[in-house]
Amino acid sequence: MKAEVVSMTADNLDMEAIRRGGDILKQGGLVAFPTETVYGLGGDALNPQASMKIYAAKGRPSDNPLIVHIAEFDKLAPIVAEVPEKAKILAEKYWPGPLTMILPKSDLVPQETTGGLDSVAVRFPSDRIAQELIKAAGGYVAAPSANTSGRPSPTTAQHVEEDLGEAIEMIIDGGQVGIGLESTIVDFTEDVPVVLRPGYISLEMLQETLGDVRMDKGLIAADSKVRPKAPGMKYRHYAPKADLAIVEGPEEAVVKKINELAAEAKAHGEQVGIIATDETKDRYPEGLVVSIGSRKEEETIAHHLYEVLRDFDQSAVRSIYSEAFYTPRMGQAIMNRLLKAAGHKIIQV
């Protein structure tokens, strides 16, 4: 089976293709679609078999919960047991948008969708294509990122086709996504809201809105018997095919160390990949150097991260060295993804 690829934009929707995509989802099939964060792999969230198909297509462990996407505020109440007041405040401020909330689930949501948990992760995306597809599918679409599990998340339809083109029925090509990192996930099943995955909406923004919000300290669960409460917590994610390491420290020391590593590799007849910035890219004479953007524009760094990791897969490099990107607002989200991609391999200088 080869996926049908249909192209459209938010300003020029192909409603006939969206209707067909909705029918595929209603019948238990899978459709990949754009959101403002990354491309999602959609299945009917209320159909246990569809959720299991998502896990199979991605090669994803079935205890890794799926996010249920809605496109209307009144679709939230039927799938949750309750909505805490603080969750209502966040929904009013950030929905539709890159925010996922974990809430106690209702009996309407099958355990297959929630990874066996009694809670459900819910998001209302702002992308118009996503919204119309969700409505056409009946209102509830479970959708993790549309990539093979463990690989960098897809920011273009081409990325989806590379990973899942033979495993799903349809890919809706809406162009390159806007943000490029997955949504912020906030858990409301505890007394104090807890950020389980950082994203575009930062911890500081959440604290300004709600007051006491905490960052989960164990974003990767060490115990394989512990069920992750949110996508991305337990398993290695976002990884390129080459080994990736992050070089941390003062800029001068980082540049010097990466150049030493590149020279050493060259002496052995190998070329390394280097993830640099606009400010440092010309300081690396050896290696395949890619700039992720300027440190002055953190949204650009976030936007290009997965694209850069995937681009290295088209090269012959076996090792990649990246600078660290502790930027003011999105630094937590960027470094969360980069550290997971590197398997937490850090070289301190």
Identify the residue ranges that each predicted region occupies.
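Active-site-adjacent structural elements in enzyme catalytic cores
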Residues: 1-349
